[in-house]
Amino acid sequence: MIRKAIVPMAGLGTRLYPIGVVLPKGLMPFALPNGILTTGLQLIAETLLAAGVEQIGVVVSPENRPVYEAFLEGGGARYAPARAKRPEMQRAYESLQTIRCHLTFIEQPELLGLGHAVWCARGFADGEPMLIFLGDHIPLPLGDPTAIQQIAQAFAAHQSPVYGVHRVPTSKVSLYGILQGEPTDAPRLYRLLQLHEKPTPEYAQQHLHTAGLPPDEFFAHSGVYAFPPALWSALEQIAAEHDPTHGEWTLTHAQRRLLQQMPAYLYETEHHWLDFGTAHEYRHAFCYLAERHDV
């Protein structure tokens, strides 16, 4: 089992402006049907821990790190009298402390893309295989680790990169990283042939369709990646070659480099994900979690 996971959360939150100016994306609140308030950070961390992950590295900006740290402190002694009178507050506090014990904050000093964010966590990784979980995705059902465990199990079987995928229609391929695979003998497991970041519908139809899927459906990243230790040497090479004046470098750069060295796989999970990275997506995620009793 992969012991560590990296959760990138260092973005400016421009798609959640102006709230993102004062509230980091990972701390956007959600109200559950039982009346409990929680955050994206908590929902992600709880699912990773339930999946057997032991250490979680959260990549944040230097400006937001104190905000995250203060949140996990849960108010400390200042709120102790109130917690003593309200059991639900004490339970929430204890939940935060459990997460805090397994969590390390890692600073990304410059916002140079997802690949750079993961590279900033190389000290935390210490050369180990790694799960990467995008910081604006919530797995469903809440707290169910099945999808993450399935990807981790596929990684354990092949010792090669495994990427969680879900299906998107042609009309939405330009919003995602799209991956073309070929079926294997294992259910829901495909061997990766190529990937392209946010292609046009025309390009996707000509080059990225996976055999066995309906003509109007494509595989897109679902926000969960399992990488072998070779990821770190690939990122080191990219970091040495990258010219900052050329803008961000994505994780796709490392995925392509690894694909030249070893096979990689796609796993289509049976579960769904909620994205809360934009105002529209956040509204949908908030309402879904608040109203559904089966999450």
What positions do the PLM features span?
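N-terminal glycine-rich phosphate-binding loop and ensuing alpha1 helix
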Residues: 2-89, 103, 144-146
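Structural beta-sheet core signal
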Residues: 5-7, 58, 132, 163-164, ...
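Cofactor-binding loop segments of dinucleotide-utilizing enzymes, especially the Rossmann-like FAD-
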Residues: 10, 32, 61, 135, ...
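Conserved beta-strand scaffold positions in the cores of enzyme catalytic domains, especially
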Residues: 27, 103-105, 161-163, 264-266, ...
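Conserved beta-loop-beta/alpha segment of the NTase-like Rossmann-fold superfamily
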Residues: 67-68, 92-184, 236
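Short, hinge-like loop/turn segments at secondary-structure boundaries
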Residues: 74-77, 150, 179-182, 284-285
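Charged, glycine/proline-rich intrinsically disordered loops and linkers
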Residues: 76-98, 198-216
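Catalytic-core segments of class I nucleotidyltransferases/pyrophosphorylases
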Residues: 131, 139, 145-148, 152-156, ...
